Amino acid sequence: MVADEEVRVRAEAWNNAFGYIKPTAVATAVELGLPDILENHDGPMSLLELSAATDCPAEPLHRLMRFLVFHGIFKKTAKPPLSNEAVYYARTALSRLFTRDELGDFMLLQTGPLSQHPAGLTASSLRTGKPQFIRSVNGEDSWTDPVNGYHMKVFSDAMAAHARETTAAIVRYCPAAFEGIGTVVDVGGRHGVALEKLVAAFPWVRGISFDLPEIVAKAPPRPGIEFVGGSFFESVPKGDLVLLMWILHDWSDESCIEIMKKCKEAIPTSGKVMIVDAIVDEDGEGDDFAGARLSLDLIMMAVLARGKERTYREWEYLLREAGFTKFVVKNINTVEFVIEAYP
């Protein structure tokens, strides 16, 4: 028994040593278009078919697919009648989530040069509070550089993928939150992807996407949505519901309180602020997303020294300091929770 445990622990150590390979392999599959190809194909595909569809040689593609099948991203299936090829591959429920309509673009951001988290999470960064990867990759603050087209497109596409995923969960699990709401202001709403889904689901809602002027200036027109430029440290457009989706985890407690106060000023006494962010449970027993939330917290520490994921008690403190009298937490069965805060 002791020997078996020693083997298990040693295997776990090796798996941790090579742990970065799995997300890299998934991102490579996304870049090749494999999840979309198999999702849109009528039935399984052979290695040669996938090779032709991706313009990738069969031998390295076989090795990539072997790894991804082992980890449950794709699956092998029986060959069709009259086929000369031994192995066929099929999509899975997991691979569907890595299509470009789902989280594929978000995966590319997390593994690309714009988000070199492993390089940022170092002993030095913990001791000094200064993320190392920012200087090593581009020498500038992560919000201002890189500004070249490719990296910013990767970032924008990833944020849009996250907005689609999370907004779908909000629509599914919190429809009552939008009853009687006339105007929703999405603070940090970028190009209005989240608002577009909300307006489609709740057609009585008018949307305002509020972000930096240089961001909203590039937003495409969307029915039912107005784009307003500005800074949430100065003021927030008036609305019945102010949405803060994945915004506050970027900021220190002091900045969060300041932002939340501005949002509170923008709503009537009958309004609310909807915060969509992770709530960290340090035990996390029985919670499928607990590990992802803890990982996200380390990512924030690596990328932004001021950023963090917060516990229930930490959120309670921020809301109280910002002047909210009560709040309700709702589980939407994803990495984030919905916190409805009332003045």
Swiss-Prot record:
PROSITE patterns: SAM_OMT_II (PS51683). S-adenosyl-L-methionine binds at D211. The keyword Phosphoprotein does not apply. It holds the Pfam family Dimerisation. Keywords: Methyltransferase, S-adenosyl-L-methionine, Transferase. The active site is at H249 (proton acceptor). InterPro entries: COMT-like, O_MeTrfase_dom, Plant_O-MeTrfase_dimerisation, SAM-dependent_MTases_sf, WH-like_DNA-bd_sf, WH_DNA-bd_sf. GO terms for molecular function: O-methyltransferase activity; protein dimerization activity. It comes from the Eukaryota. Homodimer. This is Flavonoid 4'-O-methyltransferase 4. It comes from Mentha piperita. The gene is OMT4.
